[in-house]
Regions:
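Glycine-rich P-loop/Walker A and Walker A-like loops and their local beta1-loop-alpha1 context
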Residues: 18-65
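Structural recognition of the conserved hydrophobic beta-strand(s) that form the central parallel beta-sheet
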Residues: 131-136
Length: 136
């Protein structure tokens, strides 16, 4: 039997002394604010993508309280319902191979409801200035 190459404890070693890792919300927010200011955009859009299991609401709260965005969007508000997602993925899980199922032809957009996405886009387009924060 082949040994699994699944890494249960993945990590990335950071050795660049010019760009150290930041710990703590105050330091993270200050660095983000510096980057936003350098861009000199009237309507900067900051998107924070999260790994599964991350407390997105905590990230949203911490960044909102420190960056004071004009508009805050939690991407989960545009997801299809869990029932709809179950229906979407069910054909790919029904297989003779109970461990791996079948390869899926779905893409990320399949998991979102088009109406909230268009609503968010309209709201962003109508905003003339100020930071837009999207988390999720």
């Amino acid at each position: 039997m082949r040994k699994s190459d699944y890494d249960k404890l993945p990590f990335v070693a950071v050795t660049d002394a010019l760009h150290p890792c930041l710990a703590g919300w105050d330091k993270i927010a200050a660095e983000l604010q510096r980057a936003i200011s350098r861009g000199r955009l009237e309507k900067p859009i900051l998107v924070v993508d999260c790994y599964p299991g991350v407390d997105e609401l905590a990230v949203l709260h911490e960044l909102t309280s420190r960056l004071t965005p004009k508009l805050v969007i939690h991407a989960a508000e545009a997801y299809h319902s869990p029932e709809k997602i179950d229906t979407l993925v069910k054909p790919f899980l029904e297989s003779d191979n109970l461990v791996f199922g079948r390869f899926s032809s779905l893409s990320l957009v399949n998991f979102f409801d088009a109406e909230p996405l268009w609503r968010f886009r309209r709201i962003i387009d109508e905003l003339k200035e100020g930071l837009v924060l999207i988390v999720g």
